[in-house]
C-alpha cells in the first residue's frame, strides 16, 4: 500500500540545511571556515577537525548524521575541542554562531522555494522552520532568500525550545498555531529531524533525499522519503 499524508495535517515544519538549502554548496565553505577558526591557524588540525565533524576535506561532502550534518554550534564546538581545538568551547561556540550567520548570505536554495512555499501556503498550510542552526542565522537565510512572507515560525537551537532531536520545536510550532503535534508534518534530511518528529508525536515524518541523509539512513524513521521539497506540493495535493 502506498503511504499518503492524512488529511488531518494542517501545517508543515521544515528543517533548513539539506532540506531547503543545498547543504554541500552552502556549507562546505562555511564549515571550512569554522574548522579554520577552531584550529587557530593549524592547517593539519583544520583537516582533523573537518574529518571529526563529518566533512571530507578533499571533496567537501558531509556524512549523514555527522556533527556538521545535525549538530548545533555548541555541540560542534565541544566536539572540536575534544578533537584538539585550543579554543575554549564557549568562546568557540560564539565564533561558530557568528560564522554561520555570516554564511547565510551565500545560502543556495535546493529548488525554487518561493514557488514551493507559495503553493503550500496557497493551499492553506502555515509553514515553519526548525533548525539546529542559531535563530539569527535562520532568520538571515529566510531574509536573503526572500521567504519571509511564507514562514510564520522560526526556531533554532537557541530559541528556548530545546535542541533536536528533542520534541520542543515541534510542540512550540503547534502551540504557535493552536494545533496539536499530530497535525504537524515534519520535513527533514537527517535522522535528528525525523527522531524529533517521532518524539513529538507529529502527524508525519517526511524524509528528503536532497541533503546529507540517504534512503537507508532515513527509512527507519520516515513515513515516506521524497527526492526534495519540490515534490511536497504534489504529495499534499494527493491527500
Model-derived regions: residue spans:
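Asp-based, Mg2+/Mn2+-dependent phosphohydrolase catalytic module
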Residues: 1-12, 25, 40, 118-122, ...
